[in-house]
Amino acid sequence: MIRIGQGYDVHKLAYDRDLIIGGVKIPYEKGLLGHSDADVLLHAITDAIIGAIGAGDIGHFFPDTDMVFKDADSAELLAEIWQKVEADGFRLGNLDATIIAEKPKMAPYVEQMKLRIAELLHADSAQVNVKATTTEKLGFTGREEGIASLAVVLLEK
């Protein structure tokens, strides 16, 4: 059986927050604002995986109204979902993700992100692709108000 899921997430940039994307801390003057650590990439990936197994969305499992998840490490949330997915007999076919940000430049961190995501999903890094783009200064990401991410995942059983 093959299952496909897609995920999307966006978070606002704010001062006095760490910028964590793909499980990697990126030095920058702003970070992403959210109930958890606001890792926009891991949230999109988690949502894609949840969608692939037909189990709703990330908010169903980790509601932002629950203080248990306040400042939660998104890598731990992804690992929790992945444990359920593996218990159901699925494994990663491949994952393709895009980070949409004007600044900071993501290229220096993409390889670290790939390795961290592969580790969390018990996969080879060749099964994980992460890329980044800008919106040519258009929209909220172009105005540097936030960062967005898209993810598509293929699961095999």
Curated annotation (Swiss-Prot):
The reply on keyword Metal-binding is yes
> What Pfam families is this protein classified in?
YgbB (PF02542)
Q: Where does 4-CDP-2-C-methyl-D-erythritol 2-phosphate bind?
A: 9-11, 35-36, 57-59, 62-66, 101-107, 133-136, 140, 143
Question: Which chemical reaction does it catalyze?
Answer: 4-CDP-2-C-methyl-D-erythritol 2-phosphate = 2-C-methyl-D-erythritol 2,4-cyclic diphosphate + CMP
In terms of InterPro entries, this protein maps to: MECDP_synthase (IPR003526), MECDP_synthase_CS (IPR020555), MECDP_synthase_sf (IPR036571)
EC top class, in one word? lyase
Cofactor binding, note field: Binds 1 divalent metal cation per subunit.
Presence of keyword Metal-binding = yes
Q: Which cofactor does it need?
A: a divalent metal cation
Question: Which GO terms are recorded in the biological process aspect for this UniProt protein?
Answer: isopentenyl diphosphate biosynthetic process, methylerythritol 4-phosphate pathway; terpenoid biosynthetic process
Q: What highest taxon heads this organism's lineage? A: Bacteria
Membrane-crossing ranges are none
Mind telling me which SUPFAM superfamilies this protein's record contains? IpsF-like (SSF69765)
Q: Where is this site: Transition state stabilizer?
A: H35, T134
A GO term, aspect molecular function: metal ion binding
Report the pathway entry: Isoprenoid biosynthesis; isopentenyl diphosphate biosynthesis via DXP pathway; isopentenyl diphosphate from 1-deoxy-D-xylulose 5-phosphate: step 4/6
Q: What is its EC number?
A: 4.6.1.12
PROSITE patterns referenced in this protein's UniProt entry, alphabetically = ISPF (PS01350)
User: Which amino acid positions bind a divalent metal cation, per UniProt?
Assistant: D9, H11, H43
List keywords of the entry alphabetically.
Answer: Isoprene biosynthesis, Lyase, Metal-binding
Subunit structure of this chain's protein:
Homotrimer.
Similarity annotation: Belongs to the IspF family.
- Relate the protein's function as given in its record: Involved in the biosynthesis of isopentenyl diphosphate (IPP) and dimethylallyl diphosphate (DMAPP), two major building blocks of isoprenoid compounds. Catalyzes the conversion of 4-diphosphocytidyl-2-C-methyl-D-erythritol 2-phosphate (CDP-ME2P) to 2-C-methyl-D-erythritol 2,4-cyclodiphosphate (ME-CPP) with a corresponding release of cytidine 5-monophosphate (CMP).
- Report the protein name in the record: 2-C-methyl-D-erythritol 2,4-cyclodiphosphate synthase
**Organism (species):** Listeria monocytogenes serovar 1/2a (strain ATCC BAA-679 / EGD-e)
